[in-house]
Amino acid sequence: DSLLNREILATVRFTSTPANTGKYGGELVNEQTVYFQKAPDGKMLLRSRLLINKADSVDNINRAITISNEDPIIAAFKIENLANKASKIKVGSFFLEDNVALGPDRMQKTQMGLQALLPANSYIESIKTFPMNTEVRTVKTWMASSSTNAAAALTGKVTLGLNVSFVLLPSSPMSSRLFD
């Protein structure tokens, strides 16, 4: 639980793409700052930190900004085990869901003609954890409109390889740039 409320940079990149989609392996798909938080009902929440408005914690306006900038909940996990102040959650199904946080956004899906995700045709390739980061590789398949690319035209499906890199950010962030 030492990582609760710690900011984590989640970067998603393509590891493989079908031909003629205009997307290539290694390209950035998505990037967000996320954090884990315990909910009052005992669930573990994964939230996206929206860095839209900000004030110094000692400023009077800070409370107004805080209550007017609710960070969205990306996922809620049941805590499976709690021992020695460490929470254990199952994340496998989360990585196989179709969510914007860990995959293509709506515009990218439209460009590639992606429709419904096919969980039966998707899998987790690997999960590797290191002291400061975790790498998750998935292969996901979507139903696709046939006019967008060769894979969709031939099969009605598009398969993409994705890598999600979670990097723990420093607990004391760098100071903001005051001007350029």
Predicted segments — roles?
Residues 1-180:
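Auxiliary tRNA-acceptor-end handling modules of aminoacyl-tRNA synthetases
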